[in-house]
């Protein structure tokens, strides 16, 4: 019995999820060479987003599929900090055009085809004693298939606090901490124990105590890496920040 081989174009339209961009290697895996991809673009069957990145016509790239593609390019890429808290519903107000906060293990930059559609910032950050292939408390958003990697709210909080005095105001951080009454103390404890930033650990304890949050009473400061007995001091646009051990 004769069999009919499916054309590469039909394979692309059958397998590709809505809103998903494609890299050149994805096309090659479907039997679409670089020359054939050029032909498809000229024929209007593919849209070129940038060199080596394509999407289907009349199928605008969606955020999660785009992040999944970037995760293959930037080791340890995930939604973190203020954005992670926002995704988990922990926010003080809704920004008109929020800036997506992305963190990763290595230095790099976000391509313009992505940032033109989704305003975002990428920062290399190694805040915990961990490996990029097994990031602590980072996983698919809401455990959904084909969802981007995002920090758990406990990790998002510490990533946010690590930015205080750099790209994050202390006042806004304090306001956000006030909304974290539902954080899991055991998860926060594990992250704090493996946190490499003395400032972040001290600031978490200070703001937790100031807000009388439920999780603070379940943490033992004596077991956490708070550094030496000397105060941690930093000057920013907001003034002098002094964190006692």
Regions found by a protein language model. Give the residues of each.
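Hydrophobic alpha-helical interaction segments
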Residues: 30, 134-245
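Exposed, interaction-prone assembly regions rather than primary DNA-binding/catalytic cores
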Residues: 81-140, 145
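Short beta-edge/loop segments at beta->alpha junctions of small alpha/beta modules
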Residues: 1-82, 181-196
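Short coil/turn segments at secondary-structure boundaries
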Residues: 25, 83, 97-100, 170-173, ...
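Long, compositionally biased
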Residues: 67-71, 116-119, 205-212
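Residues in well-ordered beta-strands of folded domains
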Residues: 55, 101-103, 121, 235, ...
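Short linear loop/turn motifs
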Residues: 42-44, 55, 98-103, 221
């Amino acid at each position: 019995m004769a069999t009919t081989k499916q054309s590469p174009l039909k394979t692309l339209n059958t397998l590709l999820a809505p809103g998903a961009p494609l890299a050149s290697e994805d096309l090659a895996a479907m039997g679409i060479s670089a020359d054939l991809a050029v032909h498809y673009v000229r024929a209007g069957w593919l849209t070129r987003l940038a060199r080596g990145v394509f999407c289907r016509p009349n199928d605008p790239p969606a955020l999660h599929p785009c992040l999944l593609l970037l995760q293959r390019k930037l080791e340890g890429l995930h939604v973190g900090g203020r954005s992670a808290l926002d995704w988990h519903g922990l926010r003080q107000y809704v920004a008109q055009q929020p800036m997506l906060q992305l963190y990763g293990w290595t230095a790099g930059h976000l391509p313009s085809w992505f940032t033109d559609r989704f305003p975002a910032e990428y920062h290399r950050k190694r805040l915990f004693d961990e490996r990029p292939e097994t990031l602590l408390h980072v996983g698919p958003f809401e455990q959904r298939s084909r969802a981007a990697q995002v920090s758990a709210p406990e990790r998002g909080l510490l990533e946010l606090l690590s930015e205080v005095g750099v790209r994050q105001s202390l006042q806004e951080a304090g306001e956000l901490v006030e909304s974290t009454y539902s954080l899991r103390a055991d998860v926060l404890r594990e992250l704090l124990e493996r946190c490499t930033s003395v400032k972040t650990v001290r600031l978490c304890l200070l703001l937790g105590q100031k807000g009388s949050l439920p999780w603070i009473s379940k943490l033992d400061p004596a077991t956490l890496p708070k550094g030496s007995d000397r105060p941690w001091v930093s000057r920013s646009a907001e003034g002098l920040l002094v964190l006692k051990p």
